[in-house]
């Protein structure tokens, strides 16, 4: 057999000039398979009275202090422009405007002049000399200069009308951006927190405590969409995590789960509090936290300028505690033994006792949520379809968009009814267990029972002294017998860790365990290891994953059958088995995939947790099918890349004229070696990119992609339940030109089903619409960790898992803590991008990510 695989001719990279002409493909027609069904969707019809008679005018905005220095504080631009609107109506020609909070302002029609300058005074404005004064007086005033300058070209509103009529227009995205800016301005006037196109009211009735000092704030997303059915307003429920407002000390106690302020981990607290805003009692003046003092309040000194008997200033060293208790006559109950809050600059700190500081409302919490918080968030976010319909109806009414002055100037009126669309429920794909037993899923799920599978040549290694490994083995064997799975006895029963190494590093502990295994088993290693760990995120995990094909578990106290069944599913997949396959894989009923060598690829880039993505490398994970004609078995290739880079930069990595060390070559070689053939067809699913990146991805990665991060929902017209699994929509609210569709492959048992939005960017294989939709639907049934259909295709889920597992193994989350600190301000240094550790050959070719 030919073991080499030169890059196919058609995969050679073309010059940028020829690739830059690629655009997303147009729709080839709608699908017809499946039972038709009428649905409602959370899109509301938008009517234009005179779309051809107006242009949007774009102006750049510059805000400076009175001395010409720029305004740097975020969030105050809107207040300043609101003041301009209130006090300078005549100069503005009585025109309304939409301001994006930064440097862009839009009007319907022109302002009286192309260049306008204003001076306004704002009460309680942010001081640019935040650290120049020790104390702020309440109700301080600041004068600002505002320059508004016309920034051509004009944006014709008819671009939207032209797009809806099927005409090409280069101003469509600009016009929609202005319309969305008007929606944001509407929310800003109500004092909402704005997060892209979502807004959140400062009202306690929208807050729900999810534990550890964090609230879930319920808000709404609103945006305009051009669809086959016309322009629509998409409204949906959104959720943001916010810091629980109130005393800083109370927040830290809750966040760290301690009983009193003297048990707080202040190193961790410093990272948590950075950049949060506080109001300081009794003045209620707001500041941004830059750090903590290095000493306790009773020991931290600063230089205070006081008047002597001659009315002259003299400098005196005084502690923060003494200053507030003796000079300001403010009683401090417990701050003396705690650090101070620093709101100053590195070279000139400004300290306040912590008990005088309260966190203000509507501040986003950007740290990773704990398991406890995630569990509570799911409970608080649940809304069945009828509840969501009611909430969205009230949200549209409360927003009162039809009375918005700018929307009125645009001639826009928004309907109050959910849009009715036609969908189809696709036939459920038939599955096979082994080669004989047929499985017919019901409502997107099936039983895992009497499925021919065997767990053999495995071993148990125990790194924990807190559990009974023999009980785990017995329960796993018992559960396997109930499900028809033969679980052989493991090697040597259990390999226990030598207690003398329990305090060693994870690398040493795993090496010693490996030597222990070799001394007993010789050169014939087990195919699979069940590693019992003492805790999650153990440093044993990293080395175990790179050396062994293993499943690392922290056993719960109650080993129920559901836990054991899920464990068996994962073990069987890691051992190279398949819990079920599509009938079409064995029968070849999809000729374009099953009768022509076809590789299916899933791509995703995983970034750090919110608030940490700037400091830790991103992980690109690509999975590919193997052993064609199977499309249920995959392997993964995972690489690191620079933080927040969405495009995968190592798909191709030529090191010479004849050698390439990129991801694609590695996966194509694996397909060739496992299938005995080179692929004629390549089908690629790409997750994690927005519509604005389609052209970039198309010309760099050339793929088919999906989007989970959208806000369209569907509701049955004659039932309060979720839509049926297999429901597909490819008309009305879909793109007016491009080839896209929505698919609800899974059965939504909790809350409201969220469909996956698929965009087909490029197709030279020649799928007809029904064939492609059937393939995508079927790929939601091949996820080996589950006995239910999942919401998106399995290759993408596997890419997510592979990236997450390797990120955990490399402990990237810990890298965000390694930053330099100076004067209370933490700054991240250059982010290193360490290479991914090389996996053992047997591990790399397995479904280790399951």
UniProtKB/Swiss-Prot annotation:
Concerning SUPFAM superfamilies, the annotation shows: PAZ domain, Ribonuclease H-like
- Region span, Disordered: 1-30
Q: Which GO terms describe its biological process?
A: defense response to virus; regulation of translation; regulatory ncRNA-mediated gene silencing
Family of this protein:
Belongs to the argonaute family. Ago subfamily.
Q: Name one GO cellular component term.
A: ribonucleoprotein complex
Species source reads: Arabidopsis thaliana (Mouse-ear cress)
Which cysteines form disulfides? none
Q: Does the keyword Protein transport apply?
A: no
Piwi domain location, by residue? 518-811
Q: Which SMART domains match?
A: DUF1785, Piwi
- Could you read off the lineage of the organism from its UniProt record? Eukaryota, Viridiplantae, Streptophyta, Embryophyta, Tracheophyta
Name assigned to this protein: Protein argonaute 8
């Amino acid at each position: 057999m030919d073991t080499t695989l030169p890059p196919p001719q058609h995969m050679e990279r073309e010059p940028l000039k020829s690739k830059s002409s690629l655009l997303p493909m147009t729709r080839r027609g709608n699908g017809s398979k499946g039972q038709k069904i009428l649905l409602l969707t959370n899109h509301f019809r938008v009517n234009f009275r005179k779309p051809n008679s107006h242009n949007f005018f774009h102006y750049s905005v510059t805000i400076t202090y009175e001395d010409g220095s720029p305004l740097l504080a975020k969030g105050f631009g809107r207040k300043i422009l609101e003041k301009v609107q209130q006090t300078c109506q005549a100069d503005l020609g009585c025109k309304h405007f939409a301001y994006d909070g930064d440097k862009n302002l839009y009007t319907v029609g022109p302002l009286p002049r192309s260049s306008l300058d204003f001076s306004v005074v704002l009460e309680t404005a942010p001081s640019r000399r935040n650290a120049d004064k020790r104390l702020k007086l309440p109700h301080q005033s600041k004068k600002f200069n505002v320059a508004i300058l016309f920034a051509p070209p004009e944006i014709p509103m008819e671009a939207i009308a032209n797009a809806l009529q099927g005409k090409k227009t280069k101003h469509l995205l600009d016009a929609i951006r202005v319309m969305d800016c008007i929606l944001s301005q509407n929310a800003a006037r109500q004092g909402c927190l704005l997060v892209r196109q979502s807004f959140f009211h400062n009202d306690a009735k929208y807050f729900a405590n999810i534990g550890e000092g964090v609230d879930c704030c319920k808000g709404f997303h609103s945006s305009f969409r051009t669809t086959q059915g016309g322009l629509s307003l998409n409204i949906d429920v959104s959720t943001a995590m916010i810091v629980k407002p109130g005393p800083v000390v109370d927040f830290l106690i809750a966040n760290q789960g301690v009983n009193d302020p003297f048990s707080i981990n202040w190193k961790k607290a410093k990272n948590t509090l950075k950049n949060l805003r506080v109001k300081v009692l009794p003045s209620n003046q707001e500041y941004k936290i830059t750090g903590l003092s290095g000493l306790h309040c009773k020991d931290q000194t600063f230089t205070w300028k006081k008047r002597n008997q001659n009315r002259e200033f003299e400098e005196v060293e005084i502690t923060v505690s003494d200053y507030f208790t003796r000079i300001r006559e403010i009683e401090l109950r417990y701050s003396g033994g705690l650090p101070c809050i620093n709101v100053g600059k590195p070279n000139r700190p400004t300290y306040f006792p912590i008990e005088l500081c309260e966190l203000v409302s509507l501040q986003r919490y950007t740290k990773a949520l704990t398991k406890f918080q995630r569990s509570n968030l799911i409970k608080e976010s649940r809304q069945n379809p009828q509840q969501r319909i009611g909430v969205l109806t009230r949200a549209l009414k409360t927003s009162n968009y039809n009375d918005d002055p700018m929307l009125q100037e645009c001639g826009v009126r928004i309907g109050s009814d959910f849009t009715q669309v036609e969908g189809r429920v696709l036939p459920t794909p038939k599955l096979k267990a082994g080669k004989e037993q047929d499985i017919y899923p019901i409502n997107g799920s099936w039983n895992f029972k009497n499925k021919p599978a065997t767990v053999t040549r495995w071993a148990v290694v125990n790194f924990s002294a807190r559990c009974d490994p023999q009980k785990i083995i017995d329960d796993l064997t018992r559960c396997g017998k109930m499900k028809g799975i033969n679980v052989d006895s493991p090697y040597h029963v259990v390999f226990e860790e030598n207690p003398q190494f329990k305090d060693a590093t994870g690398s040493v502990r795993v090496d010693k365990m490996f030597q222990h295994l070799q001394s007993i088993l010789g050169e014939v290693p087990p195919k699979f290891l069940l590693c019992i760990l003492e805790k999650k995120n153990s440093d044993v995990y990293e080395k175990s994953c790179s050396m062994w094909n293993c499943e690392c578990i922290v056993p719960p106290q109650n080993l129920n059958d559901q836990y054991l069944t899920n464990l068996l599913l994962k073990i069987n997949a890691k051992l190279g088995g398949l819990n079920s396959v599509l009938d079409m894989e064995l029968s070849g009923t999809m000729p374009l995939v099953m009768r022509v060598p076809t590789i299916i690829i899933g791509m995703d880039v995983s970034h750090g947790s919110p608030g940490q993505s700037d400091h830790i490398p991103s992980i690109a994970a690509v999975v590919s099918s193997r052993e064609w004609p199977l499309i249920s078995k995959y392997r993964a290739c995972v690489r690191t890349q620079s933080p927040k880079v969405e495009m995968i930069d190592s798909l191709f990595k030529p090191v010479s004229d004849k050698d390439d060390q990129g991801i694609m070559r590695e996966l194509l070689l694996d397909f060739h070696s496992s299938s005995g053939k080179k692929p004629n067809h390549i089908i690629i699913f790409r997750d994690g990119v927005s519509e604005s990146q389609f052209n970039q991805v198309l010309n760099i990665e050339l793929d088919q992609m999906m989007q989970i991060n959208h806000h369209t929902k569907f509701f049955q017209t004659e039932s309060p339940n979720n839509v049926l699994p297999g429901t597909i929509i490819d008309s009305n609210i879909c793109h007016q030109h491009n080839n896209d569709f929505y698919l609800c492959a899974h059965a939504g048992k909790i809350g409201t089903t969220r469909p996956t939005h698929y965009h087909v960017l490029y197709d030279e294989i020649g799928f007809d619409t029904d064939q492609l939709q059937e393939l995508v639907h079927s790929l939601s049934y091949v996820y080996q960790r589950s006995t239910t259909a999942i919401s998106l295709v399995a290759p993408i889920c596997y890419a997510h898992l592979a990236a997450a597992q390797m990120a955990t193994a490399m402990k990237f989350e810990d890298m965000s803590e390694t930053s330099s600190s100076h004067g209370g301000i933490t700054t991240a240094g250059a982010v290193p991008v360490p290479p991914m550790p090389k996996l053992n050959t047997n591990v790399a070719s397995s479904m280790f990510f399951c």
